[in-house]
């Protein structure tokens, strides 16, 4: 039995259900469920409330039976307000995506956060300042410009022909690709300036994951219509020199806990497109690949070197192809399961599939358990 395993067993013995944790973010399930396996009493403060969320106390924004649209219904301030009331009751706080990533985010002074705190997350979520710092430090980034109006955007497109548009604040999320020969006024008029424009670099998207200053793994990202839709972990066909480069980024930004760097490859070198200073979407695939409880490692970073992802896992977030009624059964490989008969809008997430093989057949089986809302409505009317 190695030292890491001994540490796990000793923690399980001493914790004994006495420690309390709070997990905060849009989707807290992976971290919550890891902490429950360690014996924690867990509070979940989130937007989503899947059926397989095992928290002791759940606070959520979504209507489990009528999901609506995330962009219209999400309210970061409500989550932070709830978390603030619980913060003093818990021993530790874990932060996932979707909070402290906006210009007007309220920044609490919590001193029990595991990893990067709200202030650090907010600082790095200012993409424009982060890109400027990366460039000043000598790291490769795509050519980037802050765009204040349609005229500036057109000039940028004249130079690069194709570009990627991103909001100034935020980490991860969706992006918009536009081209000079398809400069659509209808689309442009919907853009909220100022915005960031970047040169378009053709190629696959990757991420590098760290815990503290310890490199954990590379991942190949699955991007569908400009939106993160999953990943493959680990991805091993990348040079070790990339690890050194990204290690310098982690050190330069003084990042703690779990952090990720998204990048593309140009001229055989990495070009950084995002820094994510909080618990990542790859959390679960790393856990499965390494056969270790990642929450334990986040609680004690010195054991990060024991995390060795080996088995290849694929994660896919499934989105509704039309407005649907979901009736997804609980089974292996399926996560983030909605409440039975939940109505989910077109384009919104249905569930998450994580598997080593047969991923397509599993995905198809999930879609087969979803009925078209309009067809179901029509069937009811004909009864």
Swiss-Prot record:
Matching InterPro entries, A to Z? ATP-grasp, ATP-grasp_PylC-type, UCP016817_carboligase
Q: What positions does the domain ATP-grasp occupy?
A: 131-303
| GO CC annotation terms, alphabetical | cytoplasm; membrane
Q: Where in the cell is it found?
A: Membrane
Disulfide pairs here are none
Regions crossing the membrane: 6-26
The cross-references to PANTHER family, in alphabetical order and at most eight, read: COENZYME GAMMA-F420-2:ALPHA-L-GLUTAMATE LIGASE, RIBOSOMAL PROTEIN S6 MODIFICATION PROTEIN
- Quote the protein name from its UniProt record: Uncharacterized protein MJ0776
